[in-house]
Amino acid sequence: MVYDELTVQFSVCIFSCLHPVHLCAMWLYSLVLCLAGVRWKSTVQFASRPDLPKLAYKRVKGKSPGVVFLPGYASNMNGQKAEALEEFCRSLGHSILRFDYTGHGASEGVLAEGTIGTWKKDVLFVLDELVEGPQILVGSSIGGWLMLLVAIARPEKTAALVGIATAADHIVTSFKALPLEVRKEFEEKGEWTVPTKHSEEGVYRFSMDFLREAENHCVLQGPIPITCPVRLIHGLKDEDVPWHISMQVAERILSNDVDVILRRQGQHRMSEKDDIKLMVYTIDDLIDKLTTMV
């Protein structure tokens, strides 16, 4: 199968790829410490918003382009990918901001009351109020969907995109793919329960109102008006969000600079050491590309 304008890469030997000149001693030292669990801690801050819950975030100031990390559903800013990314950016002197959506982590609000629109507003607030200049948005799972939405809304604040197991439209399309009688049962209950190994309860619960609201934010029905560089990383063993979604996103994005990187052993969270190295090297390559273009 051939995908025009796309580069499909099966990552095998991570250390051999992407600008070895950047692998300086400080960079490697920082990354090794991070993966070993030794980290410089950034301070949690809280952003107040009129009539909206406070957002918790951690920020390291530095050079442009900066990086903003968008976590997945029911996740937070303290995951392995976010921690590793902060250490990497700190070692290069680039700014990074990671945060919790409304109802997630240390932010105010209730998870069950959140919507795709709610969390899109959170990211827009971060871009408008908490960072300066164009950013590299790194979105994991539902964060990958949100990064697409905000890149469309704020092209001037988006330098590049890195999606990890991008879950564009996935909640909506998965529900619609259920047999009609099964959908009707959930609609009568007013709630869709999705089995998951990522929750203590063993399921995620989505209200019918959540699903209806999410339909307003679907992006795969036509061309996606994004023209910045885009990198989409996905694991072939992802049992939560099929890797084909990243291919669909890549096919629809208008940018000519789109790479899809598939990891043969990669699972949904992409939090193994080699997964994290691939993410970091991908961002390193983008930083080099963007700073060279200036």
Where are these regions (language model features)?
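Catalytic nucleophile-loop/oxyanion-hole region of alpha/beta-hydrolase
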Residues: 104-130
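N-terminal cap/lid segment of alpha/beta-hydrolase-fold proteins
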Residues: 31-61
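Conserved alpha/beta-hydrolase
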Residues: 86-106
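Alpha/beta-hydrolase fold nucleophile elbow
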Residues: 131-140
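The serine-hydrolase catalytic nucleophile loop
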Residues: 74-86
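The alpha/beta-hydrolase serine catalytic core
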Residues: 136, 145, 157-263, 267-294
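Short beta-strand element of the alpha/beta-hydrolase
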Residues: 64-72
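Glycine-rich nucleophile elbow surrounding the catalytic serine of serine-hydrolase chemistry
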Residues: 139-149
